[in-house]
């Protein structure tokens, strides 16, 4: 590849600067906000891909600071189906200044141009070297050439360097291969995070990661790479704060985060992609976790899913693969009642589509389901929702294959004009092209007629990695053909969007719930996701937990894992399953799923000796749904992740941990090691320490050891917090669902420190399934508590016109707190 060297022309613009490099390459730096900038480097005569599907930064996508109905985000419109222009205009009023320095001598007079290393291994200064300072009052870039390189600085007390390109060559383009690369300096204290769904530890330093989407059945959560999703968002913790870089390139790529060394270069990191242009976004912050709201602002707010999405969702391949699939499914409802297991939905695996031994999307196996609507009605009558598995490929033996091929709906072989086929679930098949209006419409029609009309209200978008590796595979591109290799993850994104729109068109008032396994950043605008087909082991439990925190930090905030492990030789033993359920109930998505070699099934009641434990863990989740629902609202409307690393509260806790936070108030200390009955936890340094959730016992920040028998999940509440909960009815023959939660008494349990103090908090509720809250039909409650040694006085303030069926919010004190409590309701506001 060729290294980009000299700036041969430039033009200053109001939001940045445009450059000509080596008389051939175009480059631009555009500041879209005070703290987010966009860099493009491309062939000026022939940009490789002039569209983006990931960026969703509208003119009204400004942050909000309040918590009331007037503080809702003005959501940005989704990118056009055909993609948006990569030239994004600023969305904030700001001044961008440019300083031009024409020579190396002048450059030397500016101390802010000094690199990280005083002895940079470059040739003697070129008298014609050009340099520029471009930026806002918060973020700026220093651009130099010979070779082309950039240094990013953020304003702290003074300007400090956040990231520096490699001075011995930063940008490379393969004029024959089409590959591109970007190299940056790696400082000794830099630590790397992000990249979405990745195996191993939360910190990525010292590893190499592939960014490709694969169907990684039974992967090792500690080491397998790549996995299912395309999230090229790298977060760096530096001595001068946090730096984020998002590569808006959808081809297969590779990150070297310090695994490579080269005598001719200082320590460096690299990003390299097979195709496309060098197109990236930079952002800075004081702390690592402050980057997450910024990447969400850039790529789109998380969908606000219906309340029932927080309930337990049953699933297994076994039921729908069985010859008596309908009976197996109906038996599941009976077993929920028999064992008093709360539940809200069931995910229908693809066995409902079989004809013989093969699976054909958008068909029903009438031997298993003579009347599909009879089965779906039983679930609806039980208060349970159904989500059906759908896959974006049709085997060549599919009854619709010929018609779909003739309609030009598949990804095409550019040489033959025929469908480009690939291996897919027991045969070769064609892949639906969602960058094609005919493919989108065909998909939406079939979701409506084959699923929704049959009583299925949600879709489970699966096996959408598009492992079609022919270099001749080409997509319609909405009239502008584009090679699949350049945009592969977009297919999963637009598949999810097509399913989303089909569901919304069928039920315009409802907030759609759907799931997708694969896709790029931007996926969070439509779906919930999960970590794919994991395997049954203690190792998976441990590393899926870390994987999930990494996904959340990277912007995929609504996620979960297959509890019990999807793949493996057999189901988990009782101890592992109990610990996995305890871990799973504390994630945004809680699903028990399986497809084991021995035909066994992961079910809540599969071990009678621990069924009571499993039931109580699931009931604990349902008690906490008011808390989880508030966190879901804050994710959608404040871009606050539901799951956070413990170092989001304490910058000294960057060592690897099996703990995580729900919001910023509840610390989850899962047991992930076999045979453990105690759990050692390092508590973040916060004012007044922490309380055990169930006992009210207080702990100062620092390391503590907690009792963790099999029936106990150690949970700790930040002192001063209030945890919204509901009071569930006793177990009975009726299935507890989130509708039960909506009709059960609510209370906020205050975990206040002893003595004098002041605390405050927030709670949100609405009807749980529509967007009426955006017109004020919600319940926004803020509370403040003033406390002494003997009394607690709580002031509440409610906005919105929603009248919850659970009545008036009650307040209670943590276990062991005997102070008198008084609640004073302030006058409501319209």
Model-flagged regions — what are they?
Residues 1-308, 315-317, 324-334, 348, ...:
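N-terminal accessory segment at the very beginning of proteins
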Residues 54, 155, 342-614, 650, ...:
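Aromatic- and carboxylate-enriched substrate-binding clefts and catalytic-loop regions
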Residues 127-129, 135-137, 227-230, 236-242, ...:
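Short, well-ordered loop/turn elements at secondary-structure boundaries
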Residues 161-162, 216-236, 533-558, 566, ...:
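Internal mixed beta-strand/loop scaffold within catalytic domains of large alpha/beta enzymes
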Residues 210-213, 227-230, 329-330, 440, ...:
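Short, hydrophobic/amphipathic alpha-helical packing segments
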Residues 233, 336, 379, 499, ...:
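Conserved, mostly hydrophobic/aromatic
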Residues 305-317, 420-431:
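N-terminal small/glycine-rich loop or linker at the start of catalytic domains
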Residues 501-502, 519-529, 551-561, 568-792, ...:
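Catalytic core of carbohydrate-active enzymes
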């Amino acid at each position: 590849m060729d290294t980009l060297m000299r700036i041969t022309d430039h033009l200053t613009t109001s939001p940045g600067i445009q450059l000509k490099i080596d008389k051939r390459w175009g480059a631009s730096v555009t500041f879209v906000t005070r703290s987010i900038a966009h860099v493009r480097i491309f062939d000026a005569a022939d940009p490789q891909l002039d569209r983006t599907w990931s960026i969703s930064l509208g003119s009204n996508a400004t942050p909000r600071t309040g918590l009331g109905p007037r503080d809702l985000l003005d959501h940005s419109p989704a990118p056009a189906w055909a993609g948006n222009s990569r030239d994004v205009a600023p969305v904030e009023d700001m001044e961008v200044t440019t300083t031009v320095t024409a020579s190396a001598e002048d450059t030397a007079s500016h101390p802010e141009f000094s690199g990280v290393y005083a002895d940079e291994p470059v040739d003697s200064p070129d008298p014609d070297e050009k340099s520029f300072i471009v930026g806002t009052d918060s973020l700026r870039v220093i651009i130099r050439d010979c070779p082309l390189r950039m240094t990013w600085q953020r304003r702290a007390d003074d300007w400090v360097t956040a990231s520096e390109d490699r001075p011995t060559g930063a940008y490379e383009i393969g004029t024959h291969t089409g590959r591109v690369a970007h190299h940056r300096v790696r400082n000794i204290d830099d630590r790397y995070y992000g990249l979405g769904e990745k195996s191993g530890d939360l910190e990525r330093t010292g590893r190499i990661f592939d960014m490709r989407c694969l169907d990684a059945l039974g992967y090792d959560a500690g080491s397998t790479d790549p996995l299912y999703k395309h999230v090229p968002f790298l977060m760096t913790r530096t001595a001068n704060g946090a730096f984020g870089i998002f590569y808006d390139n959808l081809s297969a790529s590779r990150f070297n985060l310090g695994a490579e060394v080269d005598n001719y270069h200082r320590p460096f990191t690299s990003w390299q992609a097979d195709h496309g242009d060098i197109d990236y976004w930079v952002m800075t912050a004081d702390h690592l976790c402050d980057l997450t709201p910024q990447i969400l602002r850039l790529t789109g707010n998380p969908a606000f899913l219906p309340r029932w999405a927080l309930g337990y969702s049953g699933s297994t391949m076994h039921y729908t693969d069985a010859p008596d699939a309908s009976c197996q499914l109906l038996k599941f409802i009976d077993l929920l009642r028999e064992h008093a297991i709360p539940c809200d939905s069931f995910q229908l695996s693809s066995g409902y589509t079989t004809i013989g031994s093969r699976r054909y999307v958008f068909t029903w196996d009438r031997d298993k389901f003579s009347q599909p609507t009879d089965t779906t009605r039983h679930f609806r009558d039980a208060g349970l929702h159904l989500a059906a598995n759908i896959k974006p490929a049709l085997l060549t033996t599919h009854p619709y294959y010929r018609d779909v091929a003739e309609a030009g709906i598949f990804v095409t072989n550019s040489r033959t004009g025929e469908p480009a086929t690939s291996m897919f679930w027991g045969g070769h098949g064609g892949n639906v092209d969602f960058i094609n209006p005919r493919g989108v419409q065909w998909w939406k029609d079939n979701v409506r007629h084959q699923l929704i009309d049959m009583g299925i209200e949600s879709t489970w978008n699966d096996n959408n990695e598009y492992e079609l590796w022919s270099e001749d595979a080409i997509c319609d591109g909405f009239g502008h053909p584009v090679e699949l290799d350049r945009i592969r993850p977009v297919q999963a994104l637009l598949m999810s969007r097509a399913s989303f729109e089909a569901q919304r068109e069928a039920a315009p008032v409802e907030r759609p719930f759907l799931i997708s396994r694969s896709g790029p950043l931007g996926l969070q605008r439509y779906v919930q996701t999960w970590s794919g087909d994991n395997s049954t082991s203690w190792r998976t439990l441990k590393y899926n937990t870390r994987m999930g925190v990494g996904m959340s930090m990277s912007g995929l905030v609504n996620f979960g894992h297959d509890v019990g492990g999807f793949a493996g030789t057999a189901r988990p033993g009782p101890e592992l399953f109990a610990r996995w359920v305890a871990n799973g109930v504390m994630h945004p998505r809680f699903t028990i799923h399986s497809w084991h070699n021995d035909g066994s099934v992961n079910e809540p009641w599969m071990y009678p000796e621990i069924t009571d434990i499993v039931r109580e863990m699931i009931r604990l989740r349902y008690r906490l749904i008011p808390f989880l629902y508030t966190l879901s609202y804050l994710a959608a409307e404040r871009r606050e992740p539901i799951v956070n690393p413990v170092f989001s509260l304490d910058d000294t806790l960057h060592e690897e941990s099996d703990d995580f936070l729900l919001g910023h108030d509840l610390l989850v200390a899962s047991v992930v090691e076999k045979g453990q009955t105690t759990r050692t936890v390092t508590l973040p340094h916060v004012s007044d320490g922490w309380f055990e959730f169930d006992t009210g016992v207080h702990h100062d920040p620092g390391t503590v050891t907690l009792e963790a028998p099999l029936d106990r999940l150690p949970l700790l509440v930040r002192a001063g917090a209030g945890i919204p909960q509901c009071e569930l009815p006793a177990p009975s023959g009726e299935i507890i669902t989130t509708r039960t939660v909506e009709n059960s008494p609510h209370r906020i349990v205050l975990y206040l420190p002893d003595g004098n103090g002041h605390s405050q908090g927030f709670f949100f509720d609405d009807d749980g399934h529509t967007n009426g809250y955006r017109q004020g039909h919600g319940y926004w409650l803020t509370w403040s508590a003033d406390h002494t040694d003997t009394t607690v006085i709580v002031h509440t303030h409610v906005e919105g016109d929603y009248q919850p069926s659970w009545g008036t919010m009650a307040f209670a004190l943590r276990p062991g707190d005997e102070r008198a409590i008084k609640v004073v309701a302030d006058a409501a506001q319209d």
